[in-house]
Structures are given as structure tokens and as C-alpha cells.
UniProtKB/Swiss-Prot annotation:
Protein name per UniProt: Transketolase, chloroplastic
Major localization listed first in the record, in broad terms: plastid
Reaction equations catalysed: D-sedoheptulose 7-phosphate + D-glyceraldehyde 3-phosphate = aldehydo-D-ribose 5-phosphate + D-xylulose 5-phosphate
Residues given in the record as Mg(2+) binding sites: D233, N263, I265
Residue positions of the active site: E488 (proton donor)
Native source species: Solanum tuberosum (Potato)
Length: 741
């Protein structure tokens, strides 16, 4: 438990944002390392995002700024801290009020911990939000995003100017209603659905622990940063938070510090109506160090002491339970659910201004507060310069490790990496695509330094084990096999955090395809936040057989095809599996799902890595003039059925084109000319076959075509029997082809 004794700021100099005197970097040459600035290789910026200029600091400037920073911190008094905290509160109040939408309660209650983190503890460079060795901050209770926006504004981030605060939650605003990493530089991950943020934070901390174990040397600590997260009662109630916090404790993520905003208020009222567990005891049982800050409203020294204590614990994550008052300072709405999700209203805003002694106009930042916070720009630039110099020395001593780390940071793939992908011929033995996937996973792990992942307790069924590596565990964090246990939702969100840590970290995760239902929330956020996770989903159809309809996906292909910014692959054999992996590795802003078979499938003639990359392509065709009698379209295990049906139709004198539709989304990206060459508009006789829902297939088969599939649940029986009973056969395809042609 945190000590209640009073501590001065000079007694708690644990802030990593202060350059150290006598640092070796002062005499080290400046490293011009543009790819590390987060500009040319910035992984998580949309095309409309502004490029942020790199800041360079000379040796002399560095020394002056370092001295000034220490002097400023030592002279900081309670008055400027209180004024800064109230500035944060009123920026949040004013933005919500102007937007007539938002959540002022959390920012008002959490402003003290937010201030201490951003002003006294965290290391970051406001002018380069993507500096690699920065501390990461995650607001898991994303509805309180005005807290983070106010902090970014005060800290000097270009992404949150006064005009941005005034356009909160408006069309085209850079500060949307919940934090979005692709909209606001300085926001690490996209949060909003409660529990996702704490899970992302675990992923960020996993990435730091893994990279530190691999690349740090006794004489060079090149990876050294913390992950801080604020979560609320709602996050605690969500099951995903328990999943990931269990793993965080098991893995001993000592550089993960979570602040639990313990305000006892939910949307429906006091948490007593539905949430009465002992959260501290639960976290202790999960292997966390737990501290209780009893006065989160004004107990600044208590918060500082708690952070200092947390940083002293190296072998486990820390939860700091901070008891706060939601809407602190509001005379009539504080400690009430009414301040959670709506503005205070003009009268209550005025009352709050009077109560907290705030005479300023809306959105005003007092000059002494501006001056106090202005040091973070030079300090941050100095920190990055110091790290760049340290990396330059590291690169001289450890060239191979430096090259791998640089690849991970920048996302620049090693030259010729794609040559590692296996290729197959029709003479290659038949195999399940889950087994072929494992061959690809292991091939990629040999050539991609940032490739890592695991399964939700199904590694031996999903075939996801990296054979040349051990398990990532508390004492072996340098290894690359992640054991997630039966925690699908947590697994997905942790991988989002890993992917968003560094562009060259390429995480994959696996379970049975049907159990994506347990992790869909994380997968949607992956697509939204442009996190290039690879989802290895096996047992992709009724082909899994006897386990029955609880384990047989039906609607899943269609549902993911409806989701924006995600690639839904269903490869038919080895070449298509390799093609899917090639695209998945290259598409770092788009997650990919590989739906893979349990049953063995033949290596088909005509398939290719290049064809799979186009999403849909011609596998075989005995017609001329781009006008076959009928086009058969198959995916995955049913491409073999389409090929067999084509052979039967050819025997009857038909000209038949077989098309493999590996990925609808990639096919849609192709030119109109290419699509016309594959599915000519003049040929309306089309039949699709897929062991799943027929929903959406009309787009490709047209009104005159026919989609063969399954629009009900499956059954428990041997796979061959189920295929026959559901009409997923070559005979059914032949009959349909004759009907439409």
C-alpha cells in the first residue's frame, strides 16, 4: 500500500523524462536516423495524417535543456500542479459542453493521475509521437478521451491544438469521441469497447519485455519503456480484462502499470447494484502487485509515491487502485452517474468554475501552465537524441542485433524474405491446409525477426508452434511462442497491442474458426485500428466432422467478408496458403484471417502464390475467346470439388472455367479489366460452391447463377457423410451447372 507520508517532487525524481547529467550520449555523435523518427515508416497513420517534422538537438542545447528540466521539476510547487490539473478538467468540461456530447466525469476525476503521468513520469517526444523508446499510455476507459486530448494539448503534441479541442466529436475532427490511433498522433491504440484498452496495454508490455530480452546487452539497455493504462469499473467488469490480467501476472510484465479509476459509478448508478467484488484481492491472486491510493482527487504525493513503488517492483505488473470522485469539482453532479456521459450544462459549468476558483474563459490555458508544460518539447527531443546516439553505439558493437531491431522498428522487411515461402506441385502430397500453414509459419519465423504468436490452447490442433523457438514465459521472454490459454478474446486484443507497438512486429494468433465468436470484438478493433494481426483459424467448415455444429462455422466467412478493412482468406492448397501469408505479411495496416482445413486436400494444378494475391483467378479453362459455357467458383476445400465437377462437364463437351476465390477483398481491389477477364459479364452461367453460408455470393454468380452452400447449422458425423447430406458434392455442382447454362 502506498505511503501517506508527504513527499516533495525533488524526493520523487523517478521521472524518466529527465535527461541524466553525465550521460554518455552527451559525447556521442548524433545519429541521423530518419526511419526511427516514425515519419517515413510510421505504421499507424492514415493517408490524411500530417507528417510530423523531426526535431534535432545539438549537444549544447541538450545540456542546457537537461539542466533547465531538472531545475524546473525541483521548483515545481503545489500551486502550479493544482492549476495544471484544473486546466485539464476545464479543457474537458469546455470541449464536452461545446460539442454537446461526451463524458466529462472521468477527466474531472482522473486529471491528477493524468497530470502526474504526462508531466512528471512518462518519457515521450511531443514532436515525434512515434519515437520507438517512448513510454506508452493507454486510456482503456476510452469514453473519457478528453483527459488524454487535454494532456496531449498541454504536452505540445501538434495533433491536438486549441481548434481541435473546439471541434471535439465533430465531422473531420482529429479528436473523435473515443481514442483512435489512426486519427490522433499520440494515441497508441483505439479504445472504447471497455476492456480492449487494458488488453492492448498487456500486448504493448509483452512487446517491450520480448524486445528488451532479445536486444538489451549488459552494456546497452536499448529497449526500456513502460506501459501505463487507466481503466475503470466497466473495464474491470468485462471478462476480457480478467483474461489478459491473468496472463500479465503469469508473464510477470513488470513494466505494466495500471491505474484503476475506482469511482464506484456506472452508467446505471452506483456500482453496488452489480459490482461488489474485491478487485484488489482478485488482482493479487492474478499475480499483480497492488497499491491503493485512497485520495485520487488531491493526493498528488500519494499518487507519486505509488508510481515510485510500482517501478521498484520488477517481476510483476502493478495495479494502482486510485479512489476518485467522478466529476470532481462539480457542486451538484460530482459522484453521480449523471456526469458520466453528458455535459454539465451552462449553470453547472459556472458553478464548477466558482467552486474550483477558475476565472478563465472556455479553452483558456493560463500562461504559467503553458510555460510549465512547454519544457516537454525540448526534453522530448533531447531524449530521442540521446537514444539515437545510444543506438549508434549499439549498432557498432552489435550489428546483427541492430539490423533485426531496426527491421522491427521500421517495418522494413529483410530483402528476399518471400523466397522462404514454400511452393508446391500437383505431385506434392495431399495435406490439410492447417499443416501447410505451419510450414509457412516456421519458414517466415526464420526470416522475419518480428514474427511471433500462438494459440488459445490449441497449438497442436491449429498447428501453430514455431519449432525453432521456445515459449515466451516470465523467465524466457526472448522466445516467440505465446501460450494464451483458453482466452480467445484476450488473445486477439493482446495481439492488437503487439502489432501496434512496432510496425515490424507481426503477431499471429489461432483458434478454431468458429471460436472467432469469442474474440470478434478484438478482431473488429484490429480492423478499425489498422493493426496487421494474422488470424490462423483452423477447422474451417463442416469438414471437421464429428465434433458437430457447435464447432462447425457456417456464417463466419460471410460475417467477416462484411467487416471493413480485414482480409478473409480461404486457401485451397499449399500454394494458395503461401500466397495468403505473403499478402498478410505485406499488409501491415490490414489484419488477415486464414480459414484452414482440418481434412487433407490435394495440391491442385493451376494454383499459385501470384494468383492468390489477386484474390480470385483462373485455375483451369478449356474455352477460347473468354467465353466458357459455365464458370465454376470454389474456395478452400471446395475448389477441389469444383475441379472434379469441371472434369465431368468437360467429358460432356462443355467448356468450363474454374475460378478460385481465395479472398473477396483482394479481388475487389483489382482493376475492372482484370475482373472482366476472370468473370466476363457475357457469361451468366455461374455456380459457386462453398461449405458455408451462401450470403453474399449473388454478387459474383449473378441473378442467373446458383450458389451452393449451407444456410443452416451443421451436424455430427464423419466429414464425407456431412458433405454428401448437405449437397456439397461434385454431382451437385454438375447438376447446377447444367441448370444455369
Amino acid at each position: 500500500m502506498a505511503s501517506s507520508s508527504s513527499l516533495t517532487l525533488s524526493q520523487v525524481i523517478f521521472s524518466p523524462s529527465l535527461p541524466r547529467h553525465g550521460s554518455s550520449s552527451s559525447s556521442s555523435p548524433s545519429l541521423s536516423f530518419s526511419t526511427f523518427s516514425g515519419l517515413k515508416s510510421t505504421p499507424f497513420t492514415s493517408s490524411h495524417r500530417r507528417i510530423l517534422p523531426s526535431t534535432t538537438v545539438t549537444k549544447q542545447q541538450f545540456s542546457v535543456r537537461a539542466s533547465a528540466a531538472v531545475e524546473t521539476l525541483e521548483k515545481t510547487d503545489a500551486a502550479i500542479v493544482e492549476k495544471s490539473v484544473n486546466t485539464i478538467r476545464f479543457l474537458a468540461i469546455d470541449a464536452v459542453e461545446k460539442a454537446n456530447s461526451g463524458h466529462p466525469g472521468l477527466p474531472m476525476g482522473c486529471a491528477p493521475m493524468g497530470h502526474i503521468l504526462y508531466d512528471e513520469v512518462m518519457k515521450y517526444n511531443p514532436k515525434n509521437p512515434y519515437w520507438f523508446n517512448r513510454d506508452r499510455f493507454v486510456l482503456s476507459a476510452g469514453h473519457g478521451c478528453m483527459l488524454q486530448y487535454a494532456l496531449l494539448h498541454l504536452a505540445g503534441y501538434d495533433s491536438v491544438q486549441e481548434d481541435d479541442l473546439k471541434s471535439f466529436r465533430q465531422w473531420g475532427s482529429r479528436i473523435p469521441g473515443h481514442p483512435e490511433n489512426f486519427e490522433t498522433p499520440g494515441v497508441e491504440v483505439t479504445t472504447g469497447p471497455l476492456g480492449q484498452g487494458i488488453a492492448n496495454a498487456v500486448g504493448l508490455a509483452v512487446a517491450e519485455k520480448h524486445l528488451a530480452a532479445r536486444f538489451n546487452k549488459p552494456d546497452a539497455e536499448i529497449v526500456d519503456h513502460y506501459t501505463y493504462v487507466i481503466l475503470g469499473d466497466g473495464c474491470q467488469m468485462e471478462g476480457i480484462s480478467n483474461e489478459v490480467c491473468s496472463l500479465a501476472g503469469h508473464w510477470g510484465l513488470g513494466k505494466l502499470i495500471a491505474f484503476y479509476d475506482d469511482n464506484h459509478i456506472s452508467i446505471d448508478g452506483d456500482t453496488e447494484i452489480a459490482f461488489t467484488e474485491d478487485v484488489s484481492a482478485r488482482f493479487e491472486s492474478l499475480g499483480w502487485h497492488v497499491i491503493w491510493v485512497k485520495n485520487g482527487n488531491t493526493g498528488y504525493d500519494e499518487i507519486r509515491a505509488a508510481i515510485k513503488e510500482a517501478k521498484a517492483v520488477k517481476d510483476k505488473p502493478t495495479m494502482i487502485k486510485v479512489t476518485t470522485t467522478i466529476g470532481f469539482g462539480s457542486p451538484n453532479k460530482a459522484n453521480s452517474y449523471s456526469v458520466h456521459g453528458s455535459g454539465l450544462g451552462a449553470k453547472e459549468v459556472e458553478a464548477t468554475r466558482n467552486n474550483l476558483g477558475w476565472p478563465y474563459e472556455p479553452f483558456h490555458v493560463p500562461e504559467d501552465v503553458k510555460s510549465h508544460w512547454s519544457r516537454h518539447t525540448p526534453e522530448g527531443a533531447a531524449l530521442e537524441t540521446e537514444w539515437n546516439a545510444k543506438f549508434a553505439e549499439y549498432e557498432k558493437k552489435y550489428a546483427e542485433e541492430a539490423a533485426d531491431l531496426k527491421s522491427i522498428i521500421t517495418g522494413e522487411l529483410p530483402a528476399g524474405w518471400e523466397k522462404a515461402l514454400p511452393t508446391y506441385t500437383p505431385e506434392s502430397p495431399a495435406d490439410a491446409t492447417r499443416n501447410l500453414s505451419q510450414q509457412n509459419l516456421n519458414a517466415l519465423a526464420k526470416v522475419l525477426p518480428g514474427f511471433l504468436g500462438g494459440s488459445a490452447d490449441l497449438a497442436s490442433s491449429n498447428m501453430t508452434l514455431l519449432k525453432m523457438f521456445g515459449d515466451f514465459q516470465k523467465n524466457t521472454p526472448e522466445e516467440r511462442n505465446l501460450r494464451f490459454g483458453v482466452r480467445e478474446h484476450g488473445m486477439g486484443a493482446i495481439c492488437n497491442g503487439i502489432a501496434l507497438h512496432s510496425l515490424g512486429l507481426i503477431p499471429y494468433c489461432a483458434t478454431f474458426f468458429v471460436f472467432t465468436d469469442y474474440m470478434r470484438g478484438a478482431m473488429r478493433i484490429s480492423a478499425l485500428s489498422e493493426a496487421g494481426v494474422i488470424y490462423v483459424m483452423t477447422h474451417d467448415s463442416i469438414g471437421l466432422g464429428e465434433d458437430g455444429p457447435t464447432h462447425q462455422p457456417i456464417e463466419h466467412l460471410a460475417s467477416f467478408r462484411a467487416m471493413p478493412n480485414i482480409l478473409m482468406f480461404r486457401p485451397a492448397d499449399g500454394n494458395e496458403t503461401a500466397g495468403a501469408y505473403k499478402v498478410a505479411v505485406l499488409k501491415r495496416k490490414t489484419p488477415s484471417i486464414l480459414a484452414l482445413s482440418r481434412q487433407k486436400l490435394p495440391q491442385l494444378a493451376g494454383t499459385s502464390i501470384e494468383g492468390a494475391a489477386k484474390g480470385g483467378y483462373i485455375v483451369s479453362d478449356n474455352s477460347s475467346g473468354n467465353k466458357p459455357d459455365v464458370i465454376l467458383i470454389g474456395t478452400g476445400s471446395e475448389l477441389e470439388i469444383a475441379v472434379k465437377a469441371a472434369e465431368e462437364l468437360k467429358k460432356e463437351g462443355k467448356t468450363v472455367r474454374v475460378v478460385s476465390f481465395v479472398c473477396w477483398e483482394l479481388y475487389d481491389e483489382q482493376s475492372a479489366e482484370y475482373k472482366e477477364s476472370v468473370l466476363p459479364s457475357s457469361v451468366t452461367a455461374r455456380v459457386s460452391i462453398e461449405a458455408g453460408s451462401t450470403f453474399g455470393w449473388q454478387k459474383f454468380v449473378g441473378d442467373k447463377g446458383k450458389a451452393i452452400g449451407i444456410d443452416g447449422f451443421g451436424a455430427s458425423a464423419p466429414a464425407d457423410k456431412i458433405y454428401k447430406e448437405f449437397g456439397i458434392t461434385a454431382e451437385a455442382v454438375v447438376a447446377a451447372a447444367k441448370q444455369v447454362s
